[in-house]
């Protein structure tokens, strides 16, 4: 009985840990997206300020060029994290299925114990 309770707690902890990981990655994606949007705004403002919007132009602002590079890096990171989210969600679903399996097993074992106890009383 004791080891079964410990095992159930372990499985619940694993499910929660997987859930936390998914939320953490989703939070990172949201933050990176916000930062990319801010950089887009800054790029537009810098291009307006200088009057040059062609990145191939020789006098294109260095700040805008650096902001574009940073934004592109953020977008690549977002793409990578999106893949990680899918993997983390799959791991969470797997852990949830395993927990459900152990919970149903525990329910069956408790039902058997109750049946044995009630039969012993008769």
Model-based region annotation:
Residues 1-122:
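Charge-rich amphipathic alpha-helical interaction elements
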């Amino acid at each position: 009985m004791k080891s079964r309770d410990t095992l159930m707690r372990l499985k619940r902890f694993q499910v929660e840990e997987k859930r936390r990981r998914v939320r953490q990655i989703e939070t990172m994606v949201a933050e990176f997206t916000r930062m990319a949007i801010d950089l887009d705004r800054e790029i537009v403002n810098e291009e307006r300020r200088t009057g040059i919007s062609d990145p191939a132009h020789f006098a294109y602002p260095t700040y805008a060029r650096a902001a574009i590079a940073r934004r592109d890096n953020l977008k690549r990171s977002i793409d990578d994290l999106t893949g990680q989210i899918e993997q983390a969600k799959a791991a969470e679903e797997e852990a949830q299925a395993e927990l459900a399996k152990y919970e149903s097993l525990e329910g069956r074992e408790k039902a058997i114990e109750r049946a044995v106890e009630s039969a012993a009383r008769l």
